[in-house]
């Protein structure tokens, strides 16, 4: 045993001298990002619906490719489309379907995730208990947001003696959320929606929270607080009475964000107002932009659920990947 130890020590000493004589050293771990040739800046604008998810994707992508930077701004789906088609940004975030006339201008849309719009009311609404028990039918929403036939909260829940006036809030910026809500309320367009125009998703929610008689609509990630897995404090997601049985069934009442996400994923929540969210480029994406979009559709999908979004069905995800490739 002693002979073996001496021999081993002698061998190690010889190796050490050899390395020293050659001026070599054992290399340490490579710094993060070393050898990474991917670099550049990606500019993105558009839908508030996709904004939180996009910022998360950008953060995670930068951990892998630290020499890539991002400039991300909101502004609504309309701005995202205009900016993408004009070449003002590399990627436009668009929370609605791409129109034929936009495709004719070079808009190239790729679906990346699924989201939905939900009706929101103030938590202190005078008939909140009735709303949560009965739900609100699609026809009632049409009469509130489109025709204006229903103007009091008593009419909503079948109690005409309650005369509190409904205060309707809608989006003032061109956006996918409004377009999807308009499609749900009678296959209409954003400009057909009644109400006081408020800018952006957070703006509508804030208006509803400050007004006990208010009603609006918000994307999933704004209607719910992901940290608490519940509607944002001061607001309630009004159940949609889809089967018109005058009661909010368990598959229509979403007390938690998880329940709402499951309903969107399984198709129990109607589409519209559920829909895919898209990234739009001018022509088929290339270079760094394409690399980022392909990453979103592959490794980037692992962050979708924890960010409060719903993954596309596998077949649609594969279709998007093939389209972006």
Language-model region placement:
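Bacterial N-terminal signal peptides that target proteins for export
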Residues: 1-9
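Sec-dependent N-terminal signal peptides of Gram-negative exported proteins
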Residues: 9-15
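Exported/periplasmic ABC-transporter solute-binding proteins
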Residues: 23-85, 94-98, 103, 110-111, ...
